Each structure stands twice: as C-alpha cells, then as structure tokens.
C-alpha cells in the first residue's frame, strides 16, 4: 500500500458547469471576489481612519473583515486559477495548506462574531462597567486567544490529515480541500480524524453560537426597557447589523456542515460551502454599511476625505 508521500496531487472537481459556461463562471466568481476584497478593505480603512470607531465593537469588526478576506482568498483564488487554466489539480502540500488556512479563518469568523456579541452584551446590559470590562488590554487578549485557539484547531486537523495514506490520486468532490471530501479518499483508518472533526468542529461551531444566543437573550429585553427613542435606535442599529451577519453566517454554515448525508447531495454541499466561503464574506460589508449609522458616517467621511486629497 502506498503512503501519503507517494501522493503528488489531487483533482478538484469544482463547481459543475458545462465547458462553454466555465468562462462565465470565472467572471462571476472573480467579480464576487473583487467585491469582497474591496468591501472588507473599505470597512477596515473606515474604522482605522475614524476616531469615533476606535471602540471594541469596531475593533473586532475590522478583524472580522480581515478574516473574511482571508477566508475567501483561501478557497476562491485556487478555484479561479483552475477554471482559467482548465487544470483542476492541487498538489498534496497545497491541499493541506489550503485546508489549514480555510479552517483557521472559518473558525476565527465564528469566534469574532461571539466576541462582538459579548461586547454588545456588556455595552447594553452593563454600561457602567463597559470601559473596565472591555478595556484595550482585554480586547487584545481576546483577539490573541482567538488566534491561538483557531491555529491549534487548524493545525490539529492538518497534522492528522498528513498522517493518512492515500492509495491512489483521487478526485475531491469539492472546489477546495475541505476535510470531509478529502477524508473520503483515504485508505487509512480515519476514525481519529472523524472523531476530532466531531469534537473540535462541534466545539468551535456550537460554543461561539451559544455565546451569541445567550448574549442576545439578555440584550433584547434590555433594549426593550430603554425608554428614549434615540437610545433604542442606536442600540438596535449596532445589534441588528451584527444579528444579520450572524444569521447569514451560521445559516450557511449549518447548511454546509450539519445537513445529514442522506438528505444533502454533493451538489448541495458545494452550493452551501460556496455561500459560506464566498457569498457571506461579500455580503458582510453591505450589511454593516447599510444598517449601521456609525459605519455609514465613517464611510462618507472616508470618501469625502479622499476626494479632497485627490482634488
């Protein structure tokens, strides 16, 4: 039996489309990728250039935008190259590298959304303690903890995958190297891998989600108790944007990874993964800029400043 050292590359099936539609597919995903990069970069620039947004909430939002760019780049760039060159292969090392970055950025998305929910909980439910609880040192510690934990999880999955044997060069039924499709190609015992996918995957998915739900269980009644219209409007503005992103993110994530195999076909899995890795990061900047008054103001000031400089 050959081991993993004899495997040089995998074949990525990609998104099913007739050959004559491949260029159209390339154009669509290239446009979506550029919109994602532009939108999230504008969010980062707006937050960095506006002193009014130098708060914990927008600190995590800027990091979330950076992670969204990384999540999309880790999967879409290789797919675009494969479509354009019509060479749908990825090296063994490239596959493991892509898997690592996809897992790290995907898990960071979940953790940052939970951190933002906790920030809103402290700001709305315990406003007098906010400056103490969410001081810069605490935010930096939370950020570092998120990066460390997600790197550990991603490295664990990657190292466990690297120990497996692959008898033949196989076809990955996906457009990137996700864990489950690659595991199906192994001729080794994948019991440990599957157990770690269940344990670690469930932890990094469910625990942040429960933190978000718990935070909003306390936030919603607190908002309803606010008597001034201005106070309700400001609280609702920041929370509604975050809730929209949470719903889109976890909705696509659950569709991609928690649907029973007997119900979801491979095509539906690929479509759900595309929503999670491509569409969601593209929509996030629009959600925050359309529903958040502070962000809309910061973007207007950013563009007005640049127009003055250019003139």
UniProtKB/Swiss-Prot annotation:
Residues 48-55, 119-137, 218-234, 291-311 are cytoplasmic. Disulfide bonds join 95-187. Keywords: Cell membrane, Disulfide bond, G-protein coupled receptor, Glycoprotein, Membrane, Olfaction, Receptor, Sensory transduction, Transducer, Transmembrane, Transmembrane helix. GO terms for biological process: signal transduction. GO terms for cellular component: plasma membrane. It is found in: Cell membrane. The keyword Cell membrane applies. Belongs to the G-protein coupled receptor 1 family. Odorant receptor. This is Olfactory receptor 1N1. It comes from Homo sapiens (Human). The lineage of its organism: Eukaryota, Metazoa, Chordata, Craniata, Vertebrata. The gene is OR1N1.
């Amino acid at each position: 039996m050959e081991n993993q050292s004899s495997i040089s590359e995998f074949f990525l099936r990609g998104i099913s489309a007739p050959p004559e539609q491949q260029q159209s597919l390339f154009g669509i995903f290239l446009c979506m990728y550029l919109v994602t990069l532009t939108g999230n970069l504008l969010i980062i620039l707006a937050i960095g250039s506006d002193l009014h947004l130098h708060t914990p909430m927008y600190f995590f939002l800027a990091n979330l935008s950076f992670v969204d760019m990384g999540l999309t780049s880790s999967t879409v760039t290789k797919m675009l190259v494969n479509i354009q060159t019509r060479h749908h292969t990825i090296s063994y090392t490239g596959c493991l590298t892509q898997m690592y970055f996809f897992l790290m950025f995907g898990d960071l998305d979940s953790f940052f959304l939970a951190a933002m929910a906790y920030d809103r909980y402290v700001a709305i439910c315990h406003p007098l303690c906010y400056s103490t609880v969410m001081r810069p040192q605490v935010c930096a510690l939370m950020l570092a903890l998120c990066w460390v934990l997600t790197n550990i999880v991603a490295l664990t999955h990657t190292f466990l995958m690297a120990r497996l044997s692959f008898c033949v060069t196989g076809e990955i039924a996906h457009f990137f190297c996700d864990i489950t499709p690659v595991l199906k190609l192994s001729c080794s015992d994948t019991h440990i891998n599957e157990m770690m996918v269940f344990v670690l995957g469930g932890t990094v998915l469910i625990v942040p989600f429960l933190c978000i739900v718990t935070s909003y269980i306390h936030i919603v009644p607190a908002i309803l108790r606010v008597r001034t219209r201005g106070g309700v409007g400001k609280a609702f503005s920041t929370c509604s944007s975050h809730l929209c992103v949470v719903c889109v993110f976890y909705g696509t994530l659950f569709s991609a990874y928690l649907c029973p195999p007997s119900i979801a076909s491979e095509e539906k899995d690929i479509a759900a993964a595309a929503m999670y890795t491509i569409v969601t990061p593209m929509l996030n900047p629009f959600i925050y800029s359309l529903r958040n008054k502070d962000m809309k103001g910061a973007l207007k000031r950013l563009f007005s400043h640049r127009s003055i400089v250019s003139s």
